[in-house]
């Protein structure tokens, strides 16, 4: 099926260049033709950048600098039998353009060097190859300065104003529908094709118990409706440790391809969920809630979104490198249930 999608697309769009990590000459020619590099910077070295699922992301190392090329194709790169919205990379580029004048936001993101709308390619500054924050799941901690920096970025994002004429650009409806399916629907579907016991023995039984909780499923559905609301705030849409990159001078935020105009509570909830999944201390969680309170956001929605994100990362398709057995995963599903059904208890379930 994956080869079918590629072949069908290539036949229908013969004028679109599909980047190939193994074709260095073609990539050098692409960059030269767009005046993004000079002859004196070549030859280059081309390699995959990161372990992202959605897109082809390449690091092009030149004589004295490096670039990131990111191309979204109409399939999920790691699961190329799954179709995905082709416009996502262009919308991500529009996010970079929209925040450019707000230095507290753009200064903590790679610089956008070019958008190729025909081939759906972004050319970005290389934020560095020292890794992202997914080591949190092993380390079970995040430093207070790092957490403060991440929350300051979210606060600054809340100050970004999108002009009326740009509003439709950021509906990002196709990507939001895809995300909605994988966050709010698929994990709790009775027959979703996931063999959870292959991931962790006993996880299928734990998931079945949660799926039988009608109140929980109803509240998740309501939160899914809230996620689909068109709001006035620019939302990153995937604010988790894989989108936080360690650079020499601090943190860089990447991959806003799921961005949309909606409710800010979603980003805070996702962030809170990953602190729970990393088993970070309750003080870190309190810091997130204190920050959302300062932004006058709805606690019930932040906590609810956190609960849903915990569940989808445990029993959904988008698995994480979690070093836990079934007892810890059952406990985390209980945390999710409490956050969704009893948000008035706030962090009483946290441990």
Please provide the spans of the model-predicted regions.
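Active-site Asp-x-Gly
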Residues: 78-88, 232-234, 245-287
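Active-site acidic catalytic loop and adjacent metal/ATP-binding pocket
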Residues: 47-69, 217-266
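Low-complexity, highly charged intrinsically disordered N-terminal segments
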Residues: 2-5, 56, 72
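Short secondary-structure junctions
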Residues: 35-42, 103-108, 295-296
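ATP-binding pocket architecture of kinase catalytic cores
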Residues: 49, 58-169
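Active-site catalytic-loop/activation-segment of kinase and kinase-like phosphoryl-transfer enzymes
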Residues: 2-22, 168-223, 315
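Regulatory N- and C-terminal appendages and interdomain linkers associated
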Residues: 1-47, 319-351
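Active-site activation/catalytic loop segments of kinase-like enzymes and analogous catalytic loops
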Residues: 94, 264-296, 306-325, 339
